[in-house]
Amino acid sequence: MKNIFTLLPSLILLTFAVPNQSISQNIPTEEIYENLEWKFVGPYRGGRSTAISGVVSKPYTFYMGTTGGGVWKTTDAGNRWKNISDGQITVGSIGAVSVSESDENVIYVGTGSADPRGNISTGNGIYKSVDSGENWDFIGLPKAGQIGKIEIHPKNPDIVYVAALGNIFGPNKERGVYKTTDGGKNWKKIHYISERTGARDVEINPDNENEILASFWTVQRKPWMLVDGSDEGGVFMSKDGGKNWKKLTEGLPKGLMGKIQVEYSPANSSRLWAMIQAQKEEEGGLYRSDDGGKNWSRINRDHKLRQRGWYYSHINADPVNENIIYASNTGFYKSVDGGKTFDKRIYTPHGDNHGVWINPNNTDIMINCNDGGANVSLNGGESWSTQLNQPTSEFYRLTVDNQFPFRLYAGQQDNSTISVPSRGIPSLTPFENWFNAGGTECSDIAVHPTD
């Protein structure tokens, strides 16, 4: 009997092993896919970008950071774009791109877009190039989450400040203002508030490199809500290169504040601006200081400049005229009276704007970024380069139909539902091969199985 019971477990195992072996023979192995290659099928329609920069001495050279497609470069004012990050920068979400003024070969990129939609992807730190984007090295801050701004010392490319918003999905300590003095070999956190409040913006006084302006914001994305604002946020200033900080309060909103963008006027460093999202509607708006930040006053409360403040509400000062400032929101606006009015709307190829970079040698030359990509203007915004040359579309979900050759369908963020062929028609351009299959930016698409 002992031998019988010893044999039974073996029989049972054998009984189950035989069917499993049969099933495993039908499971595709890795070898089957070895000869398959990825093929780009389109579309050439730009996707969301929240990070841009340009090269002062090369007026036709610009950089674009997208929220899902990495870093791109143009050397012909936006007529053609080339990806310069694939295979080196390991995430596609880019929050900041900054080119050194003193050495234009040096570029810093911060990963993780800091305008936190619900479909945002987190970053994995800072990357650096010393050859205009040909090669990239990872230089730290892997847990900094979303990077809102990188500010490079105007005379020394090794001195860099980073506004780290932190993990957008939960609390962490790797957030605040960071500084390096050796080109990214070592980083020091120079201003920190809490594990739920991070830095959204950082600026260097153009006439005093030891004076630093920064904004802090409490924000977190949860599956069911957006946590936006607290009494910890605000505007902070350091006058000794980040060793000591003071919260600026005179004339600014009290209580809860959300996203804040700050800016020095390069033409008059005593003039500062802050676009502030405040809990009290009557306190939010554009604030200005004309005494270096000691006193502030609200000069504009127009809601078109600050709606959905957590997503838009960007400001950029003209490099040579202290009275000109640009505001990016659903529209792109220009003020010529120091921010009191924004009567001029500049029409860009796409709405939902996230900022502008202006060449200080010729302020008619600029690059704007928005939910449709990036576009270049050489005439102050009168006309722009196309966005139909950027394969950076941000799709929510992919569906295919049953025809042969099959077509692919997807809803593009802030664009339309699109249909793309799996096998393009050679006689047609990439633009002609795809078409809008429906409006809105839906995430789920259902295709009839036979029609």
Label each region the model flagged:
Residues M1-N26:
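Bacterial Sec-dependent N-terminal signal peptides
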Residues Q25-D451:
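Beta-propeller blade termini and top-face loops
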